Amino acid sequence: MNKLFSMICLSALFGCSPVKDPVDYVDIFVGTSNSRAMLGPYAAVPYGMVQLGADNQDAHWMGGYEYSINNVKGFTHIHAWMMNGLMIMPAVQDLVTWEGSSSSPYRGANAGYHSRILKETEKGEPGYYSVFLYDADCQAELTATNHCGFHKYTFANDYDNARIMLDLNYPAEYGTDIHEGYFKVISDQEIEGYADTRVAGDYILHYNIKFNKPFKTFNGWKDDKVEKNIREWKSNGDCGGFVEFDVKKDESVLVQVSLSLVDQQGCKNNYEAELKPYGWDFDAVHQAAKQEWNTLLSKIEVEGDEADKKKILYKSLSGLCQTNLE
């Protein structure tokens, strides 16, 4: 009798569907086609300054991310109304300082450092985004805290000069004018700087960038002119920098970016409060971001088993809790 009762209980247990949390109903790709730059599958926490995600369009109205385009120009940290900031992109192609237009080639003459993606690998949930970059030959993963972005790039093969591009003047919905951009090498694993940016108004974005392994060189560029192996770089207009690494197959390069609209001390404070407690544990930051969303969304309970209605409600609610910095 006891054995029969146990078998019945086990049958009932395994016959039940897994219980889903509110955050599991959110599809971050809904509403990302024919939409504004503020609406993309960005890694963010509720009301976070950082909305880290892919850009794949040229500079024009309703630019930013478009779901139907199967490439990525880079991963930008801020997607707000008339405000954007610091695009990062891994690259293993021939060195170019232009990200490339949506219609330009990916190899050879006139190619940019943008990359095609394998669309079936594009995944995401609140606080996380991932895709395989075909031309950059790596898996890109993103997560975020309030003021910080966390990147993970896992390369599929060995490369002697894999690059992480740091682009200050990239395509944006309202365009971007860099009055002054600055990078300073603090160590072979840390860079700091700022971008004095002018869109409709002026703002200065300060950034601190940390890497989990030493880079070989830091290099700056303006237009197509490159200054190699330098410690400091100041320029304007179309400018940026890049670091170079030797990487092995299946090796991950991790990048932590702390931002502030105040000063460098603000960057350091944000790093100390939001990323340092996790060390280089990308998965822990990802899970913390997901849990933050789930805690917020759980404030509204939905009775019944109508999954479609839950998807609509929790997706809409998550959209209300994104920061536009207007």
Functional labels for PLM-detected ranges:
Residues 12-20:
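Bacterial Sec-dependent signal peptides at the C-terminal "C-region" and cleavage site
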Residues 19-326:
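Accessory carbohydrate-recognition regions in carbohydrate-active enzymes
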